[in-house]
């Protein structure tokens, strides 16, 4: 094989791997949350909220607090999808729940990633996918609530308007 062919294949492989996985050039969000609650309580609140917002009717007054679909759930891991009501874009959502403090506290690592391979910006949609579930479930008012994220970890986080997205 000629060097130019190998070079072309190498460049295409690197370029393809960047677009097929979430990375800095892909619309996504990673958030860490901490609660002074057992993970079972956090798990139940999130799963209940995902199920509550499964139909389009909960978006009748605007926003995107609808069309969530629970994929799988255990007290340690929740997987869901969110479909935007207008453009029908799909985002993959995961919550990993880890107990600490003799099972009295919960650390949640959450991620939302756009399935649309060419999505680079998202107006904070992936952040709102996660935050809206936290707020809707009442967990933002829970004891010990703490959120850690940034624009580096969440596409357009600082400009997100979660009443719209």
Regions from the PLM with identified roles:
Residues 2-5, 9-165:
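Ser/Thr-rich, low-complexity intrinsically disordered terminal regions
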């Amino acid at each position: 094989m000629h060097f130019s062919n190998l070079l072309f294949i190498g460049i295409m492989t690197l370029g393809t791997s960047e677009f097929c996985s979430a990375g800095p050039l892909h619309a996504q969000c990673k958030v860490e949350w901490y609660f002074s609650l057992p993970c079972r309580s956090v798990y139940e609140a999130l799963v209940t909220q995902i199920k509550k917002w499964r139909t389009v009717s909960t978006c009748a007054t605007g926003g995107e607090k609808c069309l969530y679909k629970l994929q799988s759930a255990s007290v340690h891991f929740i997987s869901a999808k969110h479909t935007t009501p207008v453009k029908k874009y799909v985002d993959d959502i995961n919550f990993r729940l880890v107990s600490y403090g003799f099972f009295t506290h919960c650390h949640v690592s959450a991620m939302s990633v756009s399935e649309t391979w060419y999505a680079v910006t998202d107006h904070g949609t992936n952040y709102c996918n996660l935050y809206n579930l936290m707020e809707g479930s009442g967990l933002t008012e829970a004891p010990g609530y703490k959120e850690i994220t940034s624009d580096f970890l969440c596409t357009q986080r600082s400009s997100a308007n979660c009443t719209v997205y």
